[in-house]
């Protein structure tokens, strides 16, 4: 008689575990496959943080079903250099329906994935492109090395004295 309650409890525990495994695809956090060790924000929270901190934003726009997006995810997530550089940005990860409708976020088309860089005021800087990529898809990155290069360029252009001087000239 004692085996029935144990069997029932074991079955319930096994079923609960199975549900947990099925419902979890490993991308539940804001990282969505691009690395949960990176401090990701929503676009709204990211813009607020950038305005308060003076850090530029790096925005990744991708789709859950996209093959090129899936190929970039592990390269991005496993790059120690991207992880280190991410501390100099407010990192925003937009998937599927989170993609903004604003045309500023698709300067040369709506292909995916796209990586865009915004200044601390939230303005997209379309001049920061993947220099080593396809000129028809300027914001499409296929390797961690390309992303690192874009991050370094954005950091140089959107932070420090060079950015402040350019920003001041624009206001005058």
Curated annotation (Swiss-Prot):
Swiss-Prot/TrEMBL GO biological process terms: negative regulation of endoplasmic reticulum stress-induced intrinsic apoptotic signaling pathway
Cystine connections: 66-69
A single GO molecular function term of this UniProt record: protein-disulfide reductase activity
One Pfam entry name: Thioredoxin_7
UniProt EC number: 1.8.4.2
Catalysed reactions, as listed in the record: [protein]-disulfide + 2 glutathione = [protein]-dithiol + glutathione disulfide
Stored InterPro entries: AGR/TXD (IPR051099), ERp19 (IPR037462), Thioredoxin-like_sf (IPR036249), Thioredoxin_CS (IPR017937), Thioredoxin_domain (IPR013766)
GO cellular component, one term: endoplasmic reticulum
Motif Prevents secretion from ER, residue range(s) on this chain: 169-172
Signal peptide (from-to): 1-26
Subcellular location field: Endoplasmic reticulum lumen
Reported tissue expression: Widely expressed.
pH dependence: Optimum pH is 6.5.
Primary localization: endoplasmic reticulum
Keywords: Disulfide bond, Endoplasmic reticulum, Oxidoreductase, Redox-active center, Signal
Enzyme class: oxidoreductase
Stretches assigned to the Thioredoxin domain: 27-156
Role of this protein: Protein-disulfide reductase of the endoplasmic reticulum that promotes disulfide bond formation in client proteins through its thiol-disulfide oxidase activity.
PANTHER family: ANTERIOR GRADIENT PROTEIN-RELATED, THIOREDOXIN DOMAIN-CONTAINING PROTEIN 12
Protein known as: Thioredoxin domain-containing protein 12
Organism the protein comes from: Homo sapiens (Human)
């Amino acid at each position: 008689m004692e085996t029935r309650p144990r069997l029932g409890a074991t079955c319930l525990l096994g079923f609960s575990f199975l549900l947990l495994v099925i419902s979890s695809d490993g991308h539940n956090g804001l990282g969505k496959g691009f690395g949960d060790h990176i401090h990701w924000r929503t676009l709204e929270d990211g813009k607020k943080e950038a305005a308060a901190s003076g850090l530029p934003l790096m925005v990744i726009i991708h789709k859950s079903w996209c093959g090129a997006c899936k190929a970039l995810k592990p390269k991005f997530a496993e790059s120690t250099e991207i992880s280190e550089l991410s501390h100099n940005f407010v990192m925003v990860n937009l998937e599927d329906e989170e993609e903004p409708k604003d045309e500023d976020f698709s300067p040369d088309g709506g292909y995916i994935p796209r990586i865009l860089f915004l200044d601390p005021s939230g303005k997209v800087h379309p001049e920061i492109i993947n220099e080593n990529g396809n000129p028809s898809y300027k914001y499409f990155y296929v390797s961690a090395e390309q992303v690192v290069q874009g991050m370094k360029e954005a950091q140089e252009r959107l932070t420090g004295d060079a950015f402040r001087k350019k920003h001041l000239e624009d206001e005058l």
